[in-house]
């Protein structure tokens, strides 16, 4: 099944629902960064969360950055997701592995840590980005992002995230975001019924692994709440904006002396993109061209 995002409403627009399947892009991230099992789960959950948060933005170039910094051995995570369905991200310590938790599941909370902060930056592509910071609740990602939504955006929300990774890689990943809009927030019976239904779920990936589609899951959860599934299915993908010209631009900033030193000692330079793991090689000729540009720019200022 292709990675995808679908939207729906229920209760006469009182409930907003968004679901994502991110199996393939999570597997791509696992391979690119050579992630451990628990690092795959942590990054996969965060990428799904980023796409779900970005889905509510309006401007075409809108993006969401989620940065998590806990006291666990994973170090930190950074995810960049766009309204256009693209996402990228990385983990500071990708090889960290932990024993399963008390429930026999991947110990994402232990890897991330419970003491720390979650930072969210919403950027619409112009003006000043909106940023918010909340303390981590559990390090399990889903609970932490839900805490952000309730605290910073003051929207009653339920967020389900899941990644199933085994010896053959990622076989199921995705998430579901349900939000009660202001028009329905005072309907205590509706909120209670929704909370009860969500409380009976054992997680998101079991639903995917049982063969259910996002529409099936929406129908199961919201079918008797006047569910209306929007027809558009948005495709999602792991995508990075890094490029060789950007690498050359970054090298140029180092200045002539540093570039000459690289030529003399290493016969060139190598750069690796943190977000996607792509390795770029700049040989001595590329660096010499940069030095020439620097010299010409200096001469023009005289």
UniProtKB/Swiss-Prot annotation:
Disulfide bonds join 240-242, 273-276. GO terms for cellular component: cytoplasm. GO terms for molecular function: protein folding chaperone; unfolded protein binding. It is found in: Cytoplasm. GO terms for biological process: protein refolding. The keyword ATP-binding does not apply. Under oxidizing conditions two disulfide bonds are formed involving the reactive cysteines. Under reducing conditions zinc is bound to the reactive cysteines and the protein is inactive. Keywords: Chaperone, Cytoplasm, Disulfide bond, Redox-active center, Zinc. PANTHER family: 33 KDA CHAPERONIN. Redox regulated molecular chaperone. Protects both thermally unfolding and oxidatively damaged proteins from irreversible aggregation. Plays an important role in the bacterial defense system toward oxidative stress. NCBIfam families: PRK00114.1. Belongs to the HSP33 family. This is 33 kDa chaperonin. It comes from Synechocystis sp. (strain ATCC 27184 / PCC 6803 / Kazusa).
